[in-house]
Curated annotation (Swiss-Prot):
This is FMN-dependent NADH:quinone oxidoreductase 1. GO terms for molecular function: electron transfer activity; FMN binding; oxidoreductase activity, acting on NAD(P)H as acceptor; oxidoreductase activity, acting on NAD(P)H, quinone or similar compound as acceptor. Its EC number is 1.6.5.-, 1.7.1.17. Keywords: Flavoprotein, FMN, NAD, Oxidoreductase. Its cofactor is FMN. It is an enzyme of class 1 (oxidoreductase). The gene is azoR1.
Amino acid sequence: MNKTLIINAHPKVDDTSSVSIKVFNHFLESYTELIPNNETIEQINLYDDVVPMIDKTVLSAWEEQGNGQQLTDEEQKVTERMSEILQQFKSANTYVIVLPLHNFNIPSKLKDYMDNIMIARETFKYTETGSVGLLKDGRRMLVIQASGSIYTNDDWYTDVEYSHKYLKAMFNFLGIEDYQIVRAQGTAVLDPNEVLQNAYKEVKEAASRLANK
């Protein structure tokens, strides 16, 4: 059975004035109408839920786990939460990430989230010939991203749009090769309504593709 995981990386989790949230809501409305009633949709809100970052506590916990040492209560709590996030991610086979573009890159909490799911022997493994993704079982990824500028004109802005490059490369690395991005771009320089309508059309098509695959 298909399970869809929504990864909301917008700092204003349910801000209805947010362009990326508007586009996501349009997607979700179409998607839920198309999928069977028994399919599961889960959502993690990265700025509301606890998403551990790699800090002193996490590094110490990893070192102690490697040495077979007992963890402190704080270390135990944080590693258990990281495991929960990882298992939730692995249990899904369709993913939708919602984010605004922040200074040409992903929001900081999304980077923290990536550090929770990119775990050796869980989502990738090391081999003599290099790293290999372990999620090569037909999983699908849709990224919904809003930005004030336009990043597809093959100019300077295209070169420095690191969020899309990073996400696509990392999920391909994990084995998720069915990757699509829908951009609501140019909100600061184009007619905002036109930007929204174009994005609505794209996410509706994406919803149909994901629901029927």
